[in-house]
Amino acid sequence: MSNLTVGCLANATVCEGASCVAPESNFNAILSVVLSTVLTILLALVMFSMGCNVEIKKFLGHIRRPWGIFIGFLCQFGIMPLTGFVLAVAFGIMPIQAVVVLIMGCCPGGTASNILAYWVDGDMDLSVSMTTCSTLLALGMMPLCLYVYTKMWVDSGTIVIPYDNIGTSLVALVVPVSIGMFVNHKWPQKAKIILKVGSIAGAVLIVLIAVVGGILYQSAWIIEPKLWIIGTIFPMAGYSLGFFLARIAGQPWYRCRTVALETGMQNTQLCSTIVQLSFSPEDLTYVFTFPLIYSIFQIAFAAIFLGIYVAYRKCHGKNDAEFPDIKDTKTEPESSFHQMNGGFQPE
């Protein structure tokens, strides 16, 4: 583990060769607690507003006939761990670095995907149901995927899965979204106003999280170039593979966009927690910043994705044919199966 040449900071407390970990200052510690609390509250409010765009009937339709969710499951716990494994082997990174890349690939989808799904006119009902199900299934799928893919480098038993954090994430997602769904059911006009405000707040929140992460962990920015490259390729691969798999499965374009975002947008906060619980300070020197790098590039590529879609919309307008629920009621309706799930049948 000594093949990195990083100059030690003057205030480093843990050093090994030419590598070091700087202690967290009191200011950073206080700032971290305050901002974590504020961001958690803001995230709950944003998810409440996103729930205001979810219809109970359609949401339950995805649960009863979970074809879209099944595609998302294949992407989340099939494509992402495998992609992480391929990247780790291809770049020949250190074992501990390979494990962290795989931890990222095995994490469930992040809530930011719900916000972005709204901005790209995705299927919000599918987005929320996919995020909820992937977080719930992560309780079993994360240990399984880590066991399968990491055993060539480490004993998977040394990796600590924070089940309490996963449970907290699930509650923080389900409760505000459920309240939002109720508001949308009872007061649809008010829900539209809440949604508009929340969507703007959500965009600001995504940028704020990235900026805060950069401030809090600026002492760990010196990291091996290979991890920067992997952190760049990984989210883009997730978005692309998720989109193409959904399209191959016969999903309409707006659901392909949704599945793509749900696949590439990982829960980086959960990954950071697992890394901190599983590795010593000396080991963190080599890997601690990777979740932040992934977070930055997943947001950057999502922003590019959004920009391309907005430009396309301005040139061609919204294609109403891909949104069954807003078609003229005089036209012959699609089958309820296709309306709810898109199935595996082509358009």
Curated annotation (Swiss-Prot):
Subcellular location: Membrane
Residue numbers on the Extracellular membrane side: 1-29, 105-127, 180-196, 247-289
Species of origin: Oryctolagus cuniculus (Rabbit)
Residues annotated as glycosylated: 3, 11
Biased composition (Basic and acidic residues): 323-335
Modified residues (Phosphoserine): 336
InterPro entries associated with the record: BilAc:Na_symport/Acr3 (IPR002657), Bilac:Na_transpt (IPR004710), Na+/solute_symporter_sf (IPR038770)
Catalysed reactions, semicolon-separated: taurocholate(out) + 2 Na(+)(out) = taurocholate(in) + 2 Na(+)(in); cholate(out) + 2 Na(+)(out) = cholate(in) + 2 Na(+)(in); taurochenodeoxycholate(out) + 2 Na(+)(out) = taurochenodeoxycholate(in) + 2 Na(+)(in); tauroursodeoxycholate(out) + 2 Na(+)(out) = tauroursodeoxycholate(in) + 2 Na(+)(in)
Record's signal peptide: none
Entry superkingdom: Eukaryota
The keyword Transmembrane is assigned to this record: yes
This protein's encoding gene: SLC10A2
Keyword Cell cycle among record annotations: no
Name used for this protein in its record: Ileal sodium/bile acid cotransporter
